[in-house]
Amino acid sequence: LFRSVLNQPVVPALARQRGPGNVARLAALLETLPSVARLEGTAERRDDAEGICLTSSDHWFVTVGSEGDHFDYRDDQLANASVWDQAPAMRLDELVAQGKTVLEGALAPLVVLEPNEKLVAIRSFQEVRGVRNNSGALLAETIAVNVIEFARTVNDIPVLGHGSYVRLGFSPLGQLVSVDADWSRYKVLPAQRFTVATPQTMAVREGAIRAQFGVPASMVTSRFE
């Protein structure tokens, strides 16, 4: 295990890491992420067979998989903002729109879609944080992070499992708090590969993906055209 403590700048040092082109592509995204752009504190770098990990003294971390197929980022400073200043939970339509804006903007290099692919919003949830007094009694509970998860479809067929999702977390004020993406080479299940897409089969597939991820039938999904 190789360890070193990096001073500024962090990004160029990570970008020089050998390996598939995806690693450099993902590393370039660091410049767009709020806490990395601030370059506050120092970052400890760890290189091993599983990839690269940067952990900052300012409470943010980034990991990039060794094949460049997984990207994980979280800014704990934003996620742990003052509980008393938190806004209400983001509405689903706001969360989907915010996720689309980020994926089509700052994170566009991360999620590269082929012409026959689309992203589908499949579920949302909230990370809830509580405040307790010295006796341990719960004083208040608030939503710290709003999370929206997108899956990939190929020819309108949902691709389940690894290599097919992007999970974004936003503060109640709409700030990007976390990114968890697994975007490796995908495989369409053999049973689905040769199925002709019709309204009926699409309804069945939509039901299957809702069941797989626990998405209520009442939740409206959003497709990126």
What are these regions (language model features)?
Residues 2-149, 154-157, 163, 169, ...:
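Preferential activation on post-signal-peptide N-terminal prodomains/segments
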Residues 168, 175-176:
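Helix-loop elements that line ligand-binding/catalytic pockets
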Residues 201-225:
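Compositionally biased, intrinsically disordered linkers/stalks adjacent to structured regions
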